[in-house]
């Protein structure tokens, strides 16, 4: 909904982000010294069509992390188990249906809007995919420190990071429709 509001407010989002990224590239060129490579417009231009989705996803990540942190604090005060609640995270069929529609629309060429919506919904499924991994680690009693194998690749660069995020999104989406966690209680 916020993504649609942004599009309504700024008009054509591709033009808006293209102008903003062009300004960023120009500022980078002006600020660069001999030690740093300035940002090139060619590296930023492909981001313009999906920049609204990237920004909305970033806001969703920040809000989700704040919500998870607050839930963790509240569970510590009230004696609940945050880990159990997180392991049961499930977005539900409505969000799954919207993601399916956005995916079909993206395949049919309704870009960039469908791609941007898919980015935002994919962010939620990344959290659900992470919950699936934590559920597996808990149910299979993986050894301590297993999470290093999950989080270390995030520091290996953008290609590895995006591949891992795509895997988490896929895992979350599949779990949404076909329960990969038997006995899971639905918690949104």
What positions do the PLM features span?
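Long, positively charged, glycine-interspersed low-complexity recognition regions
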Residues: 111, 118-188
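Hydrophobic, lipid-facing residues on alpha-helical transmembrane segments of integral membrane proteins
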Residues: 56-73, 121, 125-129
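Alpha-helical transmembrane segments of multi-pass integral membrane proteins
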Residues: 1-12, 51-67, 90-103
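Small-residue-rich helix-loop
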Residues: 79-134
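Membrane-water interface at transmembrane helix exits
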Residues: 70-78, 134, 138
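Membrane-interface interhelical loops and short interface/amphipathic helices
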Residues: 4-51
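Aromatic-anchored segments of alpha-helical transmembrane domains
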Residues: 2-4, 98-106, 151-159, 176
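Hydrophobic alpha-helical transmembrane segments
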Residues: 34-64, 139, 162
